[in-house]
């Protein structure tokens, strides 16, 4: 698989590293990772750098992941780029909101590398 550029957005630096490690364990060895600690920071990264995949938490201060996703779509910052929400939010309402906002996948924390592989690799291959 060729180089994959991923943006990981989470207010926890530890969680960003866990997501990155899980992506590599899922088979994305040639991974270039851009990190953002908030939705607003994520938007700035997208304005400056092209990406192939976006993974975002929902619960973040100032701009939550759903608003981040809505802004990506409204500003046309990453057309066609799959977005996967990775979050502790597990209600069906949150899943529905994420899908309606444009998410292509949803992973509940805590998660395993196998779950990341099952949900992310098909999106990367299809992109």
Region roles according to the model:
Residues 57, 87:
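Active-site residues of response regulator receiver
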Residues 111-121:
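C-terminal output helix
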